[in-house]
Amino acid sequence: MKKLLKADNAPSCIDIDLSALKWRKNLSEIDLGLADYPPLLSHILNGNEYGPLMNGPDVSRHRDEWRTFIRDLAAYVPTNSALLDRFHTQWHVGHHHIRALVDDDDLLMDMLWKWLPRYNGPELLLYRGENLDRFELGRIGTAWSDKESVAKMFASGLNAEGRGGVILETIGTAKSIIAGPSAHSIHLQEYEYTIDRRRLSTISVKCHFAPRRG
């Protein structure tokens, strides 16, 4: 990030108002109007870590707090486009951690219909690289892609724990696709669509992958 403490034609000595600098540092949060929303929202928007919450001794307390937060968030109707865009990006970055922490997919999907930019395009053939154990428990994640190669990457890698991974296939419609890919997801070439699995007509297993070693 470019530092603007001294302009090219400025004198060598500059009086710096530290209070003004502090205000500038927090300007983005002021612009986003975060004071009107639950405090934990800043944790998501700032990309803070979730490991200390899930791996510490107070995980039950943190889970309760985050469930309350997600429930409260679902009651808001955000109107700030910059806020929505930032949330969309950070959801794609950390949704697997948020999902593990909250441990309530229905609660999360209800919230996402309010907080992600609505998809209104045509129906799409979509794929997901899912963990076999979670699939058999009906715990299918929200992240799908129109690129089968992306699903294969996850089914044979990150999600191939336990008994292995599977590539799932479905037809997503505007009634089941909550949001399309964020700019961040497109940059990563993952093309992640956020899906409400409760609204899918069918989900089929395309292929299996052996458990990941190591």
Q: What annotation goes with each model-predicted range?
A:
Residues M1-L125, L132-T142, D146-G214:
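Conserved NAD+-utilizing ADP-ribose enzyme module
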